[in-house]
UniProtKB/Swiss-Prot annotation:
Organism of provenance: Helicobacter pylori (strain G27)
Residues that, per the record, bind ATP: G102, T103, N104, G105, K106, T107, T108
Protein family (similarity comment): Belongs to the MurCDEF family.
Gene name linked to the record: murD
Superkingdom field: Bacteria
Entry keywords, A to Z: ATP-binding, Cell cycle, Cell division, Cell shape, Cell wall biogenesis/degradation, Cytoplasm, Ligase, Nucleotide-binding, Peptidoglycan synthesis
Protein name: UDP-N-acetylmuramoylalanine--D-glutamate ligase
Amino acid sequence: MKISLLGHGKTTLALARFFKKNHNEVKFFDDQFTAFHKDEEGFLCYPSKDFNPNDSQLEVVSPGISFMHPLVIKAKHLVSEYDYINSLFDLVFTPTIISISGTNGKTTTTEMLTALLEDFKAVSGGNIGTPLIELFEKQSPLWVLETSSFSLHYTNKAYPLIYLLINVEADHLTWHCNFENYLNAKLKVLTLMPKTSLAILPLKFKEHPIIQNSQAQKIFFDHSEEVLERLKIPSNALFFKGAFLLDAALALLVYEQFLKIKNLKWQDYRENALKRLNAFKIGSHKMEEFRDKEGRLWVDDSKATNIDATLQALKTFKNQKIHLILGGDIKGVNLTPLFEEFKNYKISLYAIGSSASIIQALALEFNISCQVCLKLEKAVQEIKSVLLQNEIALLSPSAASLDQFSSYKERGEKFKAFVLKD
């Protein structure tokens, strides 16, 4: 079979290895290629312009590629990673799948739930790092998938047993064009889910037509206390606060519902679940606190790549002066709602990256102190010179990092290095 992989990345490379083992002819097409060549593994790589839809029998798209890209528009047999993997399931092997999506918190919640479901041989995958084809080849029986809006947009058949949508706030608007498209992508899977499946959804979307018309069973939630009350767990039984408390509560709710589907009693598992969850360590670059040589508090929240994540971070330090490093690739999002919230805080801004001039203009409009630093190192130096012991220095950029860094991880690591440098 002649297979075209649109985009040369982790997901499509894993698929290419699988296709090669099964004696298919595989070609990659990507904008980053300027001429035909073979990659390190010997796969054929072509510039996007060389794609011929008549010379291809199957196209699998890398989720980050826009639906308006010429490759996608020209493709005649386009499938998502999820739909292709779904086509491989049969009577011999079909895993149980739980999908988790949301603007913020999906990685943490996926990791928490995978830890809770360890005894059921759960493995995590999807956006979190492990491509689905690798989970398939390992024949893992229970998949906990962090699922992006891009993957959901391209998927037309595959659906999970349980779908958790944590939240939807403005993000990825450059890709989706507008918020309505972004929300519809997050909800699209509900149009595919049957009566035997379950969707756990934010209460504020209850009246949305897609949700109203979905056959799936539904549970709605509003905040962490209400979720924990439903599970008969006092909020002080968990060692998390703020947005992380909601992530933990929702992981427990999905776990409880999974047990119910398996005809197992929640009360028999509850105490052990709390112990396991309280032993869970939040990943790097998510509200990660550390102190400089003078004992002053700095917070690495580099994973805050959108407005909602930054707002959640600010709530943690409501009563303290905050020195906030803001900026990067804002992905077409209007930052005005963020600045409207700044009125409720004692805050000074340090603008970096490609959106620095936008941040400066909004700061002038809202009368908020702002220094245009452009570079992260300069922002750290400026804060170091004024930061007092009872104040907070926070990197929560409300933007992607790719205008200046290879990833949010590199941005966070450099932030820590600049702070700790003499």
